[in-house]
Amino acid sequence: MAEADAAFVRSLVIYADSSLIAFNKPSGLPVQTRNRDDQTLDRLMAAFARSNGKRPRLVHRLDAQTSGVIIAAQTQPAAAALSKAFADREAQKTYLALVSGPAPEAAEGEIAHELARYAARPGLELMRAARPGDQHAQSALTRWRRLASAGGLHLLEIRPLTGRMHQIRVHLSLNGWPILGDPYYGGAGGLASGGRVRLMLHAAHLSLPHPGRAGRVCLEAPAPDDFLAVLSAAGLPAPADLVSGPG
């Protein structure tokens, strides 16, 4: 591995111990791809390989254009415990999302549309609201809270209670609030001032049972500069003092 790549992935570390390592993944870095030439977070785990060749194993995913906290297990027992925590819905996740659309009528709420996958084109699967008769409809529940609004844009705190593919993105779109910068679910446009923006979805907090000791580990990934710059351009406050984190 090139030293520059190793230095890059080490700069993303926000927490590490003998059981797990956590990163603040930037937008645009895929977790995994089928293309062997792509730089991915999974391939960058080689920077942490031990003398026996074993390296940390990622135990969950973020969409390539979503930034924020993501964790890898340092050992096989830790990988099993962390994977079980996600499967058993013991992981509490909090995201930030900048959406466009009508102002929320309440301060907070829930979205509970069932979802189903569909092939948008060869090689691209997306999600939609499930229809009567869909054999593989998946229940999905997302909680939201409005943090701030300005000029038809709304900064929301999002807590998904299930972990479906693209759940937050499609749920918000179905509720009339596409995430800014989302080309698949209605938010492809940028700010009124011009220019496209990144997908404005950031995984800010993650709390789950620690795989190597009693209690939980609570991780925080500060919103990156490219996310904060869009908020500033939209006239919205930085989220540091607005988000309560998982509880």
Task: Identify the meaning behind each predicted range.
Residues 1-247:
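RNA pseudouridine synthases
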